[in-house]
């Protein structure tokens, strides 16, 4: 699994290495040691793999735009991947004191490369469905609390 830094601080992309043959493929979608080492080396985040508390999944039809969403309070850390289909995924730095505030980064998440996007606390997140349908999976470090939801409409 490769780890790629992005132009935004604390935002990482994890790229698994699928093993393909005539039967299909096999890939590791999460590795605690790689995740923890990458976060420690490339970010200032105080999150470890053991901190994740909830996995969620959404299914979206072609052309659906979800977001931009975030979480108030102390925020949340999300690890996002597309298990089926493809999405154009976007994060926006909304941290009040960040020198990168207002800057965005986009990446295609799909069921070919299986990239994962690390979305830090204080960032807004959204995606546009590029395929007929897309299943997006979220690994989150705090259970959802609707009273902390923030977003741009």
What does each of the following model-derived ranges do?
Residues 90, 117, 125-130:
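Short beta-strand His + acidic residue motifs that chelate non-heme Fe in jelly-roll/DSBH
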């Amino acid at each position: 699994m490769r780890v790629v830094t992005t132009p935004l601080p604390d935002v990482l992309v994890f790229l698994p290495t699928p093993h393909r043959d005539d039967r299909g493929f096999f890939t590791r979608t999460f590795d605690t040691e790689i995740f923890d080492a990458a976060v420690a080396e490339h970010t200032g985040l105080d999150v470890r793999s053991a901190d994740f508390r909830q996995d969620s999944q959404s299914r979206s039809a072609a052309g659906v735009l979800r977001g931009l969403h975030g979480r108030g309070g102390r925020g949340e850390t999300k690890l996002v991947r597309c298990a089926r289909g493809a999405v154009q995924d976007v994060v926006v730095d909304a941290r009040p004191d960040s020198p990168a505030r207002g800057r965005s980064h986009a990446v295609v998440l799909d069921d070919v490369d299986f990239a994962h996007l690390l979305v830090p606390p204080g960032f807004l997140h959204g995606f546009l469905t590029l395929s007929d349908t897309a299943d997006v999976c979220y690994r989150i470090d705090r259970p959802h609390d609707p009273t902390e939801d923030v977003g741009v409409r």
